[in-house]
Amino acid sequence: MMKNKIPKMPSSNLSNDQVLRKNELLSNEVKQIVLDGNHNVANLLEDFSDASFEARNIGQAAKLYSQRLQTDTSIIWALSGSLFSAGLRQITIDAIRKNCVDVLVCTGALFEQDMLEALGHKHYKCETNVDDRELQNLMIDRVYDHLLDEIALRQVDLTFKKISDEIPNGIYSSRYFMQYCGEWLSKAEKAQDSVMQAAFEKNIPVFIPAINDCSVGIGIALSQKQGKQIIIDSIKDLREIALMKSECGNSGIIVVGGGVPKNYAQDSVIMAEMLDYQVEKHNFGIQIGTEDIRDGGLSGSTLKEAISWGKNDQEIEDVMVWGLSLIHISEPTRPY
């Protein structure tokens, strides 16, 4: 049987210099991903780095993170969004225990999610077209495609109140208060493992710049209502993270989402400079998110844009991953 003939390559009118330049530009091949019985997530991420589109960014981000974990670099995670309730809580716990993160800067909502599961409750899958009026009547809260029990969440509020009741009167940073929460959970009967406890046990500072905007703040407010003299001083936070940044030397940031945690983690450099500390700018970064850079919001702004603000080093090594954090985060490892 006669085989089909493939047409010849069309000719071109390119000059020799153009041909050389074209060959240079077309020298870095997009490699096809081959799955076999020996593949795991690490292998897949390595293959991604030679693919294209966001797969390449994911692979390059994983490679950059892996390389920096082998160096004396302090790594700050800036986390926002419903990451823990959506399934990334255990990865965060494991990353803390495996020395893959040195500082957490987070939204407070993450720690109401963390506390909810520490108390033995769960988050539950649902369809996005569920009747929210019915959910309200049933005291069920919805986060897009998953649910939580409002009664359980109120237990979370009351647990943070109890912790506030027991801490000595005083003025604290959010970092100190979260450390106290982790210590409290480590001694709590029947408490499940948690990010707070892991951070306490590994001496990882946790900063919540907007701590009033969550169950932690509600618990503290309830305690204050009954006469407790406890104040969370956000400016004390600023001073502490500035001092921390000045002492940590080389540093980089892993940004998931954006918002206040992203800005706070980056701004630690400026805070330290303004407080007359000798400080190095962040020299590597990875950002994972879906926000568009064109709307001018902080969450979507690139890590290179922050160079102009003096937050990141002019030679920062960074990777921007445009996509959902839940898909793109996997567990890293560190040699010590």
Q: Which role does the model predict for each range below?
A:
Residues 2-62, 66-69:
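N-terminal glycine-rich anion-binding loop in soluble enzyme alpha/beta folds
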Residues 61-74, 198-200, 243-250:
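Glycine-rich phosphate/diphosphate-binding loops that line cofactor/substrate pockets in enzymes
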Residues 74-82, 104-106, 253-256, 286:
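Short glycine-rich or small-residue beta-strand-to-loop segments that form or flank ligand, phosphate
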Residues 92-157:
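A generic, well-ordered mixed alpha/beta core segment in the N-terminal half of proteins
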Residues 134-216:
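Ligand-binding beta-strand-loop-alpha-helix segment within the catalytic cores
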Residues 209-252, 261:
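Active-site rim loops that border cofactor/substrate pockets in soluble metabolic enzymes
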Residues 280-304:
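Short, flexible loop segments at boundaries between secondary-structure elements
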Residues 327-336:
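Single conserved hydrophobic/aromatic residue that forms the stacking wall/gate
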